[in-house]
From Swiss-Prot:
This is Chloride channel protein 2. Changing L27E: Constitutively open channel. The chain crosses the membrane at residues 94-127, 136-161, 186-204, 211-229, 281-301, 327-355, 364-383, 435-455, 463-486, 537-554. A motif (Selectivity filter part_2) lies at residues 209-213. The lineage of its organism: Eukaryota, Metazoa, Chordata, Craniata, Vertebrata. A motif (Basolateral membrane sorting) lies at residues 821-822. PROSITE patterns: CBS. Residues 710-720 have a biased composition (Polar residues). Residues 22-40 are annotated as: Essential for channel gating by both voltage and cell volume. One of its GO terms (molecular function) is volume-sensitive chloride channel activity.
Length: 907
């Protein structure tokens, strides 16, 4: 009986609208294995059957300040003061401004504290290395042990507390902003795991980044802040406002990371949104600017800076920063960076795929989860050991010190009439005794390239923006030093001579490679804000645009690649310059076998429709012959209809009618035994997978004011009925009446898979009539067969009268735009009101990937080659379809909504 109830709760939860994905921790990235799957159904069933969350109080339970005045405790007085202050601030300032100020302040404090802790960790490693320079073996052990311990701690701490904190965070935020709910992704424990894990990972000195994880951290901070402010009431009780605040939080994450508010807003829009609501523009700029300001003020307060300056300030020439003849060199940097960015994304994805295909190694490393990050860290630390191979790749420099030296405007080569100002101490790392600048830069680029691609697969909180940024700066510096060597006297223009500035080439290379990996143009703006100079705006823009053009034609962005690795729901971008996307139409890609129910169907038809599809929506048509689309109905509504029709309450009513018909007239005058006088206790020991899963079988789906008394009574009686009869009914409904032994074994097997088994004793009250008048299983099955043949009354169901619809000749390009703009996951295809197919996110994704490229060969749908674009529906077909609209008036369903209503419902 417990298994039958658990199975019913699972099936009843299949139609719940929130979409959640099951997270599975793998060796590297982790992935979401259930595509809107069983985990969401179980969670929906638990929430529906178990009631509201324990931390959420009812709105009516919130006390007003007037009522709080009666309390004499100190807590009551503090609550009154806080409520009054909140009302004053809201009336004078506004809720959005308060939220954005708090968000910017908190993120600036977190960013500064993390930078301070990371700097202390890196200084400790350098101090240990210098203190043991007399013994090369001890120095090596200290150099490799320190990062291995930090990375291992970061991986273990994250795995234990919140595995969702692993990785960048931008791919998941892109999915969340599209409407998908990721379980435990914006919680407090994930925030703690992300902050501590990222601090340890970056403090180890591995080639990892901070920008991507900080987007996730800012989003978690915004979600937690929204929950806190919702305790005071106001607009943050509305969950739809959280999406707007998450969009602003993504901008804050980049802004407080690099003190680049403008570039942070633009970068967050490019990497997380396909279509951006302009109403959120000012929120992102305000919060990012305030956060960047506080972040730099804290640096001045800590005496790290004398005043508010750029993070990597440069001193390039302003009167003549570059010559026109240098533009081809900048263009070469952009094209080469495009190929390099595509190669980096490909290499990163291949590392993950190869490790997953090696089943034996993968199985072994999954059992020893900390072994893989420890081995990768040991390998990278060994290669960067300064007295060893690290001397040929500036291994003793941190990422910040590396960028400072690469952006230096002085040349490192000593040939001809070059500017000899004396290299700074950190620049000496690029000129080892047994190598020159060019060899060191080449080795640095090649080694850091594959090291960064490998290090970003470690299951710790980390990003890839900063390592790619450093590699691009090194490549630009290599081109700049080469130009300075080829033109030692500079490029002659008229009577003036201007020497080459290699630091400018490094800035161009950093922006180009970072833009190629992320498929963004806003990296140019980030570079300008990082360096504090805009002198090289034209070379930077040329290189970034060329790099994006090359990279987008070869590989997806790094974040889209991770989305595919983690198997998150996504909608790929349409390739530009492809004419196939305009010739492919919806009728070529739609699924013609649409799960639907007719208005005049029986309950048997409903059960058959549930067995045929696992989707959360069913189309409601006028009749199987006309196929006129009347609306859509959720799967949960259909399950509720079937459950109410075959409920124990209806079966008891049927038994009472039979008993009254069999009784003689004198016996009819006798009063039936009162339920108050003959009550017995039934004690059932049950195994429940959900807390409170047996408290009630079905939660009414309509508000209490809209339900009739008979419906409410039947549902309430159904919850306290005999569980054995309910189990037989549910098995007959969802399992097609299988043998009792096989059903029992399957239910026991499903129970064994449940991780949260709770032993609970259920005490219910049952009358004598219920105990004495039981029906046999054969009688129950016969009665259920009769009930399944009755017609369905949809008047008590919630029906969407205006589901999103497309016509069969809608192009693939327009369909992609509609799905991206509205965030819908399915659309019905109609022809003059007649349902002919359905298009889901899965079919659209396959069509886009097939029409753009498939293994290097363009693929077109089969019907696209035989279509005549000039043809249209015949007059006979049009007349026949219009004739079907007449009988619709006899049905009492809500009329179809306007297209604007449909758009609003799909958002």
């Amino acid at each position: 009986m417990a298994a039958a109830t658990a199975a019913a709760a699972t099936v009843a939860g299949e139609g719940m609208e929130p979409r959640a994905l099951q997270y599975e921790q793998t060796l590297m990235y982790g992935r979401y294995t259930q595509e809107l799957g069983a985990f969401a159904k179980e969670e929906a069933a638990r929430i529906r059957l178990g009631g509201p969350e324990p931390w959420k109080g009812s709105p009516s339970a919130r006390a007003t300040p007037e009522l709080l005045e009666y309390g004499q405790s100190r807590c009551a007085r503090c609550r009154i003061c806080s409520v009054r202050c909140h009302k004053f601030l809201v009336s004078r300032v506004g809720e959005d401004w308060i939220f954005l100020v708090l968000l910017g302040l908190l993120m600036a404090l977190v960013s500064w504290a993390m930078d301070y802790a990371i700097a202390v960790c890196l200084q400790a490693q350098q101090w240990m290395s210098r203190g043991l320079n007399t013994n090369i073996l001890l120095q090596y052990l200290a150099w490799v042990t320190y990062p291995v311990v930090l990375i291992t701690f970061s991986a273990g701490f994250t795995q234990i507390l919140a595995p969702q904190a692993v990785g960048s965070g931008i791919p998941e935020m892109k999915t969340i902003l599209r409407g998908v709910v990721l379980k435990e992704y914006l919680t407090l424990k994930t925030f703690v795991a992300k902050v501590i894990g990222l601090t340890c990972a970056l403090g180890s000195g591995m080639p990892l980044g901070k920008e991507g994880p900080f987007v996730h951290i800012a989003s978690m901070c915004a979600a937690l802040l929204s929950k806190f402010l919702s305790l005071f009431g106001g607009i943050y009780e509305n969950e739809s406002r959280n999406t707007e605040m998450l969009a602003a939080a993504c901008a804050v994450g980049v802004g407080c990371c690099f003190a680049a508010p403008i570039g942070g807003v633009l970068f967050s829009i490019e990497v997380t949104s396909t279509f951006f609501a302009v109403r959120n523009y000012w929120r992102g700029f305000f919060a990012a600017t305030f956060s960047a300001f506080i972040f730099r003020v804290l640096a001045v307060w800590n005496r790290d800076e004398e005043t508010i300056t750029a993070l990597f300030k440069t001193r390039f020439r302003l009167d003549f920063p570059f010559d026109l003849q240098e533009l081809p060199a900048f263009a070469v940097i952009g094209i080469a960076s495009g190929f390099g960015g595509a190669l980096f994304v490909y290499l990163n994805r291949k590392i993950v795929q190869v490790m997953r295909k090696q089943k034996t190694i993968n199985r072994f490393l999954m059992k020893k989860r900390l072994l893989f990050p420890a081995l990768v860290t040991l390998l990278i630390s060994t290669l960067t050991f300064p007295p060893g191979f690290g001397q040929f790749m500036a291994g003793q420099l941190s990422q910040k010190e590396t960028l400072v030296t690469l952006f230096d405007n002085r040349t490192w080569v000593r040939q001809g009439l070059v500017e000899d100002l004396g290299a700074p101490s950190t620049s000496q790392a690029w000129s080892p005794p047994r190598a020159n600048v060019f060899l060191t830069l080449v080795i640095f680029i090649l080694m850091k390239f594959w090291m960064s691609a490998l290090a970003t697969t470690i299951p710790v909180p980390c990003g890839a923006f900063m390592p790619v940024f450093v590699i691009g700066a090194a490549f630009g510096r290599l081109v700049g030093e080469s130009m300075a060597a080829w033109f030692p006297d500079g490029i002659h223009t008229d009577s003036s001579t201007y020497r080459i500035v290699p630091g400018g080439y490094a800035v161009v290379g950093a922006a180009a490679l970072a833009g190629a990996v992320t498929h963004t143009v806003s990296t140019a703006v980030i570079v300008f804000e990082l360096t504090g100079q805009i002198a090289h705006i034209l070379p930077v823009m040329i290189a970034v645009i060329l790099a994006n053009a090359v990279a987008q034609s070869l590989q997806p962005s790094l974040y889209d690649s991770i989305i595919r690795i983690k198997k998150l729901p996504y909608l790929p971008e349409l390739g530009w310059g492809r004419h196939q996307q305009y010739r492919v139409r919806v009728e070529d890609i739609m699924v013609r076998d649409v799960p639907h129910v007719a208005l005049s169907c029986t309950f048997r038809d409903l059960r058959l429709a549930l067995h045929r599809t696992k989707g959360r929506m069913l189309a409601l048509v006028e009749s199987p012959e006309s196929m006129i689309l009347l609306g859509s109905i959720e799967r949960s509504q259909v399950v509720a209809l079937l459950g109410a029709q075959l409920s124990p309450a209806r079966r008891r009513q049927h038994m009472q009618k039979l008993r009254k018909a069999q009784m003689s007239p004198p016996s009819d005058q006798e009063s039936p035994p009162s339920s108050e006088t003959s009550i017995r206790f039934q004690v059932n020991t049950e195994d429940s997978g959900f807390p409170g899963a047996h408290g009630q079988t079905h939660k009414p789906l309509k508000p209490a004011l809209k339900r009739g008394p008979s419906n409410a009574t039947s549902l309430q009686e159904g919850t306290t009925g005999n569980m054995e009869s309910a189990g037989i009914a549910l098995r007959s409904l969802f399992c097609g009446s299988p043998p009792l032994e096989s059903t029992t074994s399957e239910l026991e097997k499903s129970e064994s898979c449940d991780k949260r088994k709770l032993k609970r004793v259920r005490i219910s009250l049952a009358s004598d009539s219920d105990l004495e008048g039981k029906m046999s299983p054969e009688e129950i099955l016969e009665w259920e067969e009769q009930q399944l043949d009755e017609p369905v009354n949809f008047s008590d169901c919630k029906i969407d009268p205006a589901p999103f619809q497309l016509v069969e000749r809608t192009s693939l390009h327009k369909t992609h735009t509609i799905f991206s703009l509205l965030g819908v996951d399915h659309a019905y295809v109609t022809s003059i009101g007649r349902l002919i197919g359905i298009v889901t996110l899965k079919e659209l994704r396959k069509a886009i990937e097939g029409s753009v490229t498939a293994q290097g060969v363009k693929v077109r749908p089969p019907l696209a080659s035989f279509r005549d674009s000039a043809t249209s529906s015949s007059d006979t077909e049009t007349t026949e379809v219009h004739a079907l609209w007449g009988p619709r008036s006899r049905h009492g369903l809500p009329r179809e909504g306007t297209p604007s209503d449909s758009d609003d419902k799909c958002q």
